Amino acid sequence: MKINPTYNTKEAAIALYNSPLMDLMYQAATIHREYHNPNEVQMSTLISIKTGGCPEDCSYCPQSMKYHTDLEVQPLMKVDEVVGLAKNAKASGSSRVCMGAAWRNVRDNRDFDKVVEMVQEINGMGMEVCATLGMLDAAQAERLKNAGLYAYNHNLDSSQEFYKDIISTRQYQERIDTIKNAREAGISVCSGGIIGMGETAEDRIGMLMTYVHMEQPPESIPINALVAVEGTPLQDQNPVLVWDMVRMIATSRIMFPESIIRLSAGRTEMSDEAQALCFFAGASSIFAGDKLLTTPNPEYNADVALFKTLGLTAKSPFQDGVQPETKYDEKVEKAKQARADRAAKVANAQPKSADFEPRKVSVK
């Protein structure tokens, strides 16, 4: 995975984010078409394999045991139950399954043994297997990799500066360390954040800049709109504006042209037209199913209808290989030249002021 060298400073990235929306969307759509099939969107399924009872205090999360959200705590699911849900997901068009457990960190116990078995079973189905289990060390990452784990999700959530306003039980550096452990084990990295928590545009870009400064940016970058859940500290936050979501997706697409930009939480508050704008701006994945861990998500039939309307097809998994390598500099220079040629052609077609004579109109 590579980054766009034009926007490898915070100042340049902020200017990009704040550029006229139509220009921003056009640039993002152009880059998206250079690196991805714009009519393919990956359908992923997120399964909450262990729900609630988390000791962390993430202000947005209804699974924290510190908040009263009426969420029923559920133990780790049985292996065959999870495999059955994965089979249903595959039959419905999903090529990726992400298993989420409300843990602060992975522990070397029977529950982890069961998760490893789940990974092995789903990997054997020819699907991309992703997991989000909290912090993990290098040895645990290696074990998951050997079991067939394709990707590990560990979001940064926001910028390092804003992070302390929403979480106190886990340090920002601990998140970066977990990403590093997954990366060094040879696991694909999925990491993104949430907008609408009260952060500024600079905070949103600050999160993306953390990925810019990594040795390799994430293969997947999920962009979530806050789902304000009653009982959490962020319950009174206003819904995210569609335009903010489009800006964040477009900026992410331009800065990380090879990565999969995932349109994640918050789609229930978005119209079909709003989601179409996100796809146009570079989103190339959604989560299918009526829930994202514990929060609502559009029903499967609604997504099928949306795909049909937009002419989208479900993307096959990268299970048998890696995301295709691209030559960024070469492609961008080629695209820049093509745009310059088109602009010159349009300019030459315009009548020169000296040659232009206004048409005379007789008035009776």
What are the residue ranges of the model-derived segments?
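Short, composition-biased local secondary-structure segments
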Residues: 59-60, 87-90, 107-120, 145, ...
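Glycine- and other small-residue-rich loops at beta-strand/loop junctions that grip anionic moieties
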Residues: 47, 133, 171, 193-196, ...
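Residue-level signature of catalytic and energy-coupling elements of molecular machines
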Residues: 20, 58, 154
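Auxiliary Fe-S-binding modules of radical SAM enzymes
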Residues: 1-39, 212-364
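Conserved Radical SAM active-site core
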Residues: 16, 65-192, 196-213
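Glycine-rich, proline-tolerant flexible connector loops at the mouths of alpha/beta enzymes
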Residues: 42-48, 68-71, 98-111, 162-163, ...
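Hydrophobic faces of well-ordered beta-strands that scaffold small-molecule active sites
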Residues: 41-45, 97-99, 129-131, 152-154, ...
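Local cysteine-cluster metal-coordination motifs and their immediate loop/turn environment
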Residues: 48-65
